[in-house]
Amino acid sequence: MKPRSGLEEAQRRQASDIRVFASSCTMHGLGHIFGPGGLTLRRGLWATAVLLSLAAFLYQVAERVRYYGEFHHKTTLDERESHQLTFPAVTLCNINPLRRSRLTPNDLHWAGTALLGLDPAEHAAYLRALGQPPAPPGFMPSPTFDMAQLYARAGHSLEDMLLDCRYRGQPCGPENFTVIFTRMGQCYTFNSGAHGAELLTTPKGGAGNGLEIMLDVQQEEYLPIWKDMEETPFEVGIRVQIHSQDEPPAIDQLGFGAAPGHQTFVSCQQQQLSFLPPPWGDCNTASLDPDDFDPEPSDPLGSPRPRPSPPYSLIGCRLACESRYVARKCGCRMMHMPGNSPVCSPQQYKDCASPALDAMLRKDTCVCPNPCATTRYAKELSMVRIPSRASARYLARKYNRSESYITENVLVLDIFFEALNYEAVEQKAAYEVSELLGDIGGQMGLFIGASLLTILEILDYLCEVFQDRVLGYFWNRRSAQKRSGNTLLQEELNGHRTHVPHLSLGPRPPTTPCAVTKTLSASHRTCYLVTRL
């Protein structure tokens, strides 16, 4: 640090003077407190007002910061129009899981107890109720049994159920559906987007601009109710779920029913939901591992099918969680569950998998946050009876069935968008950083009449004080030490001069070499001067 002159020192002292700073600071009130003169009542009142305003300002700032730290959010609802909408996936399941005509004695041997609650002694009577002969003498069951193969073979076939199919007036068929296993058995999904298939869209709303299908529920194939079990179906019809292609169906929990003898109109409205991630919300955007989750375990043999990681969904997360839990407890998975574990045998279904899954659902141990973006479909249902008296005979001739069969087995399902718009439900942060800064600035201007530049002025003044009072202290101390050292040196030199004897300019005896006269001084320079003299 260079030495400072007296003028620089005075300017530095003036810059760090609180009175000089208060007279030029833009913060209101400081000039009235630190002005020239002594303590007066007016100055005390100004000091009190400034302190109270400063306390109120700090309280408001702390309150705003606390509110911001709670990370509140708000939900907005907006109705938006679109030129076209992607048609949803539609999953259909017959309420009856297995056809009576396809069950064999081998099926009853392996799965009769687990699925139907039959004792081995009741197999013959049940086969007679199915209209089939009992097992022949010497019947030997197969060494192994696969539940997925049972449902693929004995479940209702879409080729037999689907009487008519049209999408936006154009014909469609079983090839437009994808087989998928759910807890209700073998089901079928329209417009699933599986295997890279292009998703269908619609440019118009209203009936006739969606999916219209006519189905035969095949009541003659329904299994006879032998015992009242927990999952025994007493109804007849089709279970339907309308969902996004990004999530697997949970039709046993979220599906609605369509009854035979009725045409069911389903008016849909698309809802696009957006949730916030932490700390404002708890949504998740991570993709699910295909080893833990495959939303299409539709291979009857249960062989794993490699595919890209599916997007995160709430239903997919729960299925993956349930699959891992059952696999850990039982060493297998239920046929509708994702994963690479082997499909449980009927005995494992009865003894382990079903009880474990029910216990898990009661405890609700799966913690699955909402996805950050998802699509749902609001529905409005209405029904009319079919067939009319005028159409009953025509339909009976067309499908080679009786009029009573048409009334008891045939249904029509019409799914369409209500209008070509959708609802955008979005979570947003209720209090942003910009709002926090705006509130702090407003409180600062209201209570103490300051701004961001005022804070810079205060920081600049504190730097001046630090440089003058702290660094200046060490500089002055160092300068004092230097001055003290110079004084001691000067005194030592002066002391040496006082010990040198008075030299006369008159005649004197011959001088001796410097080695002799060196005793007059310890300095070589002094020795030289004395010798010259």
Swiss-Prot record:
Which Pfam family would be a valid example here?
ASC
PTM remark = Could be phosphorylated by PKC, promoting activation of ASIC2/ASIC3 heterotrimers.
Q: Where is this region: Disordered?
A: 286-310
Induction is noted as:
Transcriptionally regulated by the proinflammatory mediators nerve growth factor (NGF), serotonin, interleukin-1 and bradykinin. Up-regulation upon tissue inflammation is abolished by anti-inflammatory drugs.
Q: In which tissues is it expressed?
A: Expressed in sciatic nerve and dorsal root ganglion (at protein level). Expressed in sensory neurons of dorsal root ganglion. Expressed in Golgi interneurons in the granular layer. Also found in superior cervical ganglia, spinal cord and brain stem.
Give the UniProt record's GO annotations in the biological process aspect: detection of chemical stimulus involved in sensory perception; detection of chemical stimulus involved in sensory perception of pain; detection of mechanical stimulus involved in sensory perception; detection of mechanical stimulus involved in sensory perception of pain; detection of temperature stimulus involved in sensory perception; detection of temperature stimulus involved in sensory perception of pain; establishment of localization in cell; membrane depolarization
Its chief place of residence is membrane
Which effect does the record note for changing V20P? No effect on ion selectivity or channel function
**One GO CC term, this protein:** plasma membrane
Residues spanned by motif PDZ-binding: 530-533
Q: Which residues carry this modification: Phosphothreonine?
A: T40
Q: Where are the transmembrane segments?
A: 20-40, 436-456
Q: InterPro entries recorded for this chain?
A: ENaC, ENaC_chordates, ENaC_CS
Q: Does the keyword Membrane apply?
A: yes
Modes of activity regulation: Inhibited by the diuretic drug amiloride. Inhibited by gadolinium ions. Inhibited by extracellular Ca(2+). Activated by lactate. Salicylic acid, diclofenac and aspirin inhibit the sustained current component. Activated by the vertebrate neuropeptides NPFF and NPSF, and the related FMRFamide. Specifically and reversibly inhibited by the a sea anemone toxin APETx2. ASIC3-containing channels are potentiated by the cono-RFamide CNF-Tx1.1, and probably CNF-Tx1.2 and CNF-Tx1.3 (AC P0DL71).
- Stated role: Forms pH-gated heterotrimeric sodium channels that act as postsynaptic excitatory receptors in the nervous system. Upon extracellular acidification, these channels generate a biphasic current with a fast inactivating and a slow sustained phase. ASIC3 is more sensitive to protons and gates between closed, open, and desensitized states faster than other ASICs. Displays high selectivity for sodium ions but can also permit the permeation of other cations. As a neuronal acid sensor, probably contributes to mechanoreception, acid nociception, and heat nociception.
Q: What is known of its domains?
A: The PDZ-binding motif mediates the interaction with PDZ-domain containing proteins including DLG4, GOPC, MAGI1 and LIN7A.
What does the sequence similarity comment in the record state about its family?
Belongs to the amiloride-sensitive sodium channel (TC 1.A.6) family. ASIC3 subfamily.
Descriptive protein name: Acid-sensing ion channel 3
What is the originating organism of this protein? Rattus norvegicus
Q: Which gene encodes it?
A: Asic3
